[in-house]
C-alpha cells in the first residue's frame, strides 16, 4: 500500500501536486472514462467531453477523497474507527473505503434519509445511526460521538487529503486529453473544484477551470463576493448533492486562488442537462451530477464559444428513480422548449379556438381552465417552442397585440410546482388569506407537526403537496389571516420549516385567490 503523507495546515500548490501523485486512491477507486458527447458536440459546435465519475464503485467521485484521507490514518486511528455525517455520496464513499481498509465506520444520517441511501451505506459495510432532522443535527451528533469515543472525523470536503484525493480526477483528465481548453466542475462544499483546479494549474495552467453552482445553493459565489466564507440563509434541495450552506475554509482558499470563473444555473437547466446526458451517452445522472454540464451549456451561450474542447464532470449518479418524473416535466423549460403563460380570454364560445389560431399552429402542451367568471376566463397554457427565448418573446408580443392580457410564468417556480395542478380552485366568496410555500422533510410526523403548529389556530384555506422523490417535499398552503397576526409569525418560526410568502405571486392571483 502506498503511503499517504499528511499535508501542512495550508499547503501550497506544489505540495498538493505531490499529494495527488502519492494518493493511493486506486486501491479502491477506478480510472473513469472521458467520453465524447457526439450529439451535443454537433449541436453546440464544440467538442463536449464528459468525465464519467458515475462509473465508480459507489457511483460518484466521493470515493476518491474519502479513501485518500482514510488510507493516511495511523494504525491507532484505524483501530478506533472513523465517523462522518452525510445523507448521500460521501457516506457511501466512507463506507466503501472502510470495508477496503478494514476500518470500522459509523455513518450518522438524518432520520429523513431515504431508505435506498441507508441501505446502500449498509451494503458497502458501514454502520448507520439515524439521528436529527437535518444534516446539521446529524453532523453535530457525529462530532459529539467522535470526541466521546475516539472516532476520527472524516469531513466531506474541507480537508487537504480529501481535496488531494479529488484532485486525482484532474490528473486522469489531463492524461486522457492534454488539449482541453476549459474544464467545468460542480461545486457543493468545494472539495472537487479545489482539487481539480489546484492540480490543473500546477501542470497545465493555460486550461481554464470554471466552477458551476446551483443558483439556490451558491455558497462559493457568496464567499467570493464577500471575500470570505459566509452562511447562506437557505439552500435549495433539488440538487441535494451540492446543497451546502457554507463553503469550506480550505476549499475556498484554493478556489479563490486557482479558479478562472464561476457560473450559476437554475433547476430547469439542470433537468435539461440530465436529459442531454441520457440521450447522448445513456447516463442517468443525479441532479448535482449534471450540474457541470448545465453550467457549460450556459457558459457557451453567454460567451459565444465555438470550436473548443470542453470537459465537464458527471460527478454522481445516485438518483432517486421517483425523482425522474419531476426531471421529465421540467427539462423542456430548461431547454427553452416550452413557455408557460397565464392568459385572460373572453368567456364566450369560440374564444379558445380563436386563441389557438392566433398561436399560428404552435403545439399547445398544457391547458388548464375552469369556469369562474361570466365575462373573462383565466387560462394556464403551455406552448411548445422551437426557437427558445426569442420565440417566447414573440408570442408574448403577439398576444398583447391581439388584445390579450398575458403574464409569462415560465420562470415562476410556484406556478411550475403547484399552480398548474390546481387551476380552477377559486373560493366561492372572497377570503382574507395569505399564501406560503414550504419545504417539508419527507419523514413520518412532518405533516402532523405542521397541522399541530399552524392548523390548530388558523384555518387552512388551500393546501397542495406533491412528492418529487427527494428527502424534502414542496407544500403550498394558504391561511385565513387578518392584517396583523404577530402570533402567526411566531408559530412559523417555531415550525422551523423553510417558507416564503407567496401572497402576491401573479399565478396565485390569476388562478387561485379569492
From Swiss-Prot:
Pfam annotation, one family: PALP
Repeat is among the record's keywords: yes
Keywords from the UniProt entry: Allosteric enzyme, Amino-acid biosynthesis, Branched-chain amino acid biosynthesis, Isoleucine biosynthesis, Lyase, Pyridoxal phosphate, Repeat
Reaction catalyzed: L-threonine = 2-oxobutanoate + NH4(+)
Any one GO MF annotation of this record: threonine deaminase activity
EC class: lyase
Enzyme Commission code(s) on record: 4.3.1.19
Activity regulation note: Isoleucine allosterically inhibits whereas valine allosterically activates this enzyme.
Residues with PTM N6-(pyridoxal phosphate)lysine: 62
GO process annotations (BP): branched-chain amino acid biosynthetic process; isoleucine biosynthetic process; threonine metabolic process
Binding site for pyridoxal 5'-phosphate: 89, 188-192, 315
Induction remark: Constitutively expressed.
Residue ranges of domain ACT-like in the record: 339-411, 434-504
Listed NCBIfam families: ilvA_2Cterm, PRK09224.1
Family: Belongs to the serine/threonine dehydratase family.
Complexes and interactors: Homotetramer.
Stated name of the protein: L-threonine dehydratase biosynthetic IlvA
Organism (species): Escherichia coli (strain K12)
Record gene name: ilvA
